[in-house]
């Protein structure tokens, strides 16, 4: 999973510009905007391969009061996530067992023309592993819970402006829920959550504070033919992400990391999906502009991609 590690360079520049101490604040590892509709639905039994592309761009940085800091610049990244789900036929506690791994590649850049400041990096980023997922399919609800961790496999060096990784481990408690609001299950309410706990950052005395993310969506399904072989899904989605505990340790200049203001960011947007159940195919597009941020960049997130499931062959009864 890719993360906002490149914000460090932007904050380091603002340290010089705004004379504000300790602005090299870490952001959450989980990039919001990846979930939305169908948040509680696990893939069918078998192997599911997905490709998800994220583009985030921002030209505004907000202070602890949500006001714009008067510096002209741009911050953005592209990330390509190659995702594999494995869902065996095994049942645990009456629910489906699943596992997931994400293998990401990222490219990011930060530019502040006034000061001739440019930074960025490209390469393999941090790896997301979700070894345990348990999901249940009820009459009007699909839900799952999982444990995941973020491994610091991306390139990282303290105070470098070309980092692709975050330089620390993350442990995550994750969940997803889809509620069917109508009998025909065409109208849904969705919620995904992620609670992050971080280790100390490599080569420093800093421990980023814990973060909590929710992603939500309200969706409607529309058949595109009488046989229901092609389905269009449209909905309103959004995300909210907060830092929930103070940063730990000290920065390289001796300033306590706990003095850094807590960050948060909030967005609302739209999602469209094309589902082809007979071919086990799904394609999706999401657009979420951020409308509020504190101690964080404010911009917009675009996500698009697709998935395909290879189902296990059915065993014929003799």
Language model features with spans:
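Transmembrane beta-barrel strands of outer-membrane/channel proteins
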Residues: 49-57, 99-107, 145-151, 191-197, ...
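Sec/Tat signal peptide C-region and signal peptidase I cleavage site
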Residues: 19-24
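Residues that define the transmembrane beta-barrel architecture of outer-membrane proteins
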Residues: 74-80, 118-128, 165-171, 206-214, ...
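Outer membrane beta-barrel transmembrane domains
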Residues: 29, 62, 68, 203-318
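Surface-exposed strand-loop-strand hairpins of Gram-negative outer-membrane beta-barrel proteins
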Residues: 26-27, 56-79, 113-120
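Short loop/turn motifs that connect adjacent beta-strands in outer-membrane beta-barrel proteins
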Residues: 25-26, 39-46, 88-98, 136-143, ...
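Residues on the lipid-exposed face of transmembrane beta-strands in outer-membrane beta-barrel proteins
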Residues: 39, 51, 82-88, 129-136, ...
